UniProtKB/Swiss-Prot annotation:
The gene is aroA. GO terms for cellular component: cytoplasm. It comes from Ralstonia nicotianae (strain ATCC BAA-1114 / GMI1000) (Ralstonia solanacearum). Monomer. Keywords: Amino-acid biosynthesis, Aromatic amino acid biosynthesis, Cytoplasm, Transferase. This is 3-phosphoshikimate 1-carboxyvinyltransferase.
Length: 436
């Protein structure tokens, strides 16, 4: 197996220009494809997941033309109706692609199949399918019930009651419905989505609502319990849109700035960000890091304690589910036990991240308690360098988060480092540029 040996690292300093946000990139691509008019998308993330979305849109007949400048595309909108009325779509392991596309395709009146890598066929999609079936969508499971692959058939869509969808497994189900429902033919009469259970990852819904508004569709919400979505309205191309830097990816460099003394600055995301994971900086500050920020940048200059340790903390991570993985590894360097709660969504990501995180932290000597939706980490009393290395489970965020363990007293071997291509292909080059 390919591996990368990192550390032990003693210092971190420098500036990193972040790649575009995955969550924003794939939402913007789909909205631009569904809109009336042309959208120039700039600073689009170049990664496995965005390539999956671009390939799917191409198969569906959407023109996405790369421009001369880096990571810029001109997307010619379809006015809500894809030219291709039948297609077989490979979705890799891109949840941000398969879920919103499933909803949009269910309303197209065509015949489509969606499938992916084996892990994708283990990631639940039943709550979204149940929601779409409430309006008459015809979607069949061709493998295990509740999971991809999916077969979508032409259907007569009708909305005569509120749509109910669970919110406690993945916010992407709600995002998919929100983005698709304006495509339903109608007079603009709104349809109500009712959320069953507690909605997790609320900041990702904020991203969805913000971007829908940029494309001319306003959604009204009643707290987080229900949403009123207009139907029969057209998305309108905004002309040009810039993709923010990825706030989840920023977390690794900010943590490095704390553990390695800094200063480390990330550019492309800051206090004006629409991404919830930007609040990772607040959590890092609570752990004792020296954090400064502007509208489009965040900088960390070491920690306030002379011994370089972080403060242990207990934190509800509903608002930073991806960046919370960085906190779990940073907890190796705390002065006590850190508890991260409300992270049940980790179990349905690229891997079961709760079990994976607990397993790999223990390899380094940490004492770890893994619960249904929480993890409790006590730093090692004696660090160990696992002979077999840190396994990454084909999960980009496992690989990136555990690079921070190299600030400990032992070298760290990262297995399958190329899995970072899902969102940040050049991560280890960028990390090596600021850490030594």
């Amino acid at each position: 197996m390919e591996h990368l040996d990192v550390g032990p690292l003693k210092a971190a300093r420098g500036t990193v220009k972040l790649p575009g946000s995955k969550s924003i990139s794939n939402r913007v691509l789909l909205l631009a494809a569904l809109a009336e008019g042309e959208t120039v998308v700039r600073d689009l993330l170049d990664s496995d997941d965005t390539r999956v979305m671009l390939a799917a849109l191409d198969t569906l007949g959407v023109r996405c033309e790369p421009l001369g400048t880096a990571n810029a595309y001109r997307v010619t909108g379809t006015g809500g109706r894809f030219p291709a009325k039948s297609a077989d779509l490979f979705m890799g392991n891109a949840g941000t692609a398969i879920r919103p596309l499933t909803a949009a395709l269910a309303l197209q009146g065509g015949e489509y199949t969606l499938h992916g890598v084996p892990r994708m066929h283990e990631r639940p999609i039943g709550d979204l399918v149940d929601g779409l079936r409430q309006v008459g969508a015809r979607i069949d499971y061709t493998g295990n019930e509740g999971f991809p692959p999916l077969a979508i058939r032409a259907a007569s869509i009708r909305i005569d009651a509120p749509i109910r969808v669970r919110g406690d497994v993945s916010s992407q189900f709600l995002t998919a419905l929100l983005m698709a429902l304006p495509l339903v033919e109608g007079s603009g009469r709104p349809v109500t989505i009712e959320v069953v259970g507690e909605l997790i990852s609320k900041p990702y819904i904020e991203i969805t609502l913000n971007l829908m508004a940029r494309f001319g569709v306003q959604v009204e919400r009643n707290g987080w319990a229900s949403f009123s979505v207009p139907t029969g309205v057209a998305y309108r191309a905004p002309g040009e849109i810039f993709v923010e830097g990825d706030a989840s990816s920023a977390s690794y460099f900010l943590a490095a700035g704390a553990l390695g003394g800094g200063p480390v600055r990330v550019e492309g995301v800051g206090m004006s960000s629409i991404q919830g994971d930007v609040r990772f900086a607040d959590a890092l500050n609570r752990m004792g890091a020296n954090v400064m920020a502007g509208d489009n940048w965040i900088e960390v200059r070491g920690v306030e304690r002379d011994d370089g340790k972080l403060h242990a903390l207990e934190l509800d991570c509903n608002h930073i589910p991806d960046a919370a993985m960085t906190l779990a590894v940073a907890a190796l360097f705390a002065d006590g036990t850190t508890t991260l709660t409300n992270i049940g969504s980790w179990r349905v990501k690229e891997t079961d991240r709760l079990t994976a995180m607990a397993t790999e932290l223990r390899k380094l000597g940490a004492a770890v308690e893994e619960g249904t939706d929480y993890i409790r980490v006590t730093p090692p009393s004696h660090w160990t360098a696992p002979a077999g290395g840190i396994d990454t489970y084909d999960d980009h965020r496992m690989a990136m988060a555990f690079s921070l363990a190299a600030f400990g007293p032992v070298p760290v071997r990262i297995n399958d480092p190329r899995c970072v291509a899902k969102t940040f292909p050049e991560y280890f080059t960028a990390f090596g540029g600021i850490a030594a």
